[in-house]
Structures are given as structure tokens and as C-alpha cells.
Amino acid sequence: MPSIKITSGGYEFLAETHPDAPQTVEAFLKLLPYRQKIIHVRWSGEACWVPLGEFQLLRGDAPVGFENHTSHPSVGDVLFYPGPYSETEILLAYGSCCFASKMGQLAGNHSLTIVQGKENLRALGVKTLWEGAQEVLFELA
């Protein structure tokens, strides 16, 4: 499966796509290059997120559903939450994390895992917490 380069806050990361989330990966790859803003989470602990509102990640004409989903990502795991209980989002864990929103615990599709640059994730998280929103770019490596 292809690798994704993630650039944010002056840091570069290399992520591998997850074979257990093929629908999410297939649909997300069609968006690349994908540029957005990343902010610090409010409810989930040590993570940053890309709020996507009502956006739906589509595979063909159908929204991507849950696959390989978890509420407890490890450092370097990237989750795509397809909704519908909270807004659609991308979550990037840099430390201890229990994925949640104001309505309670959520589970997102573990679709990417950072394999290079992981040592800079905490620095990105702290920068995002104290300096605010950062540009983030997802592109094919």
C-alpha cells in the first residue's frame, strides 16, 4: 500500500496506509494532495485533529463506514472518523489518547500509521496546543 507524507508545523512525517482499512485508504488517497488546518483536541487527551464538519469521505457514491476502528490510538496512529455521532474528523495521536467528543467516546478508522518522524509528534502537539492551528498537508510520498 502507498505511503503518505504528512507535513505540519515545520515537521515531516511518513505514514504507511493500513491494510485493515482499505475503503478508508482508497477514498482518502483520491483527495491527495489534501491541505487543511490541524488543531489540538478538546476531549481526547494528547492528540491533534482536523475538524471536517459535515464532510463525507466517499467510496463511489456511498460514505465510508467503520472499519479497523478504535477509541485508543497509539502514538503515531492516524484515525479517520466518518461520523455520524459527532463531526467528521481526522485525529493524529501524539501521546495518551482516548478518542472522544462532547457527547462521549468515539471510534475512528485506523487508516494510517506514522513510521518516520514519530519522535517529532510530541513537539507538533505541544506547538499546536500553545501556538494554535497549524497548516497540515497530506500527500503521496
Regions found by a protein language model. Give the residues of each.
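N-terminal intrinsically disordered, low-complexity, charge/repeat-rich segments that act as generic
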Residues: 1-20
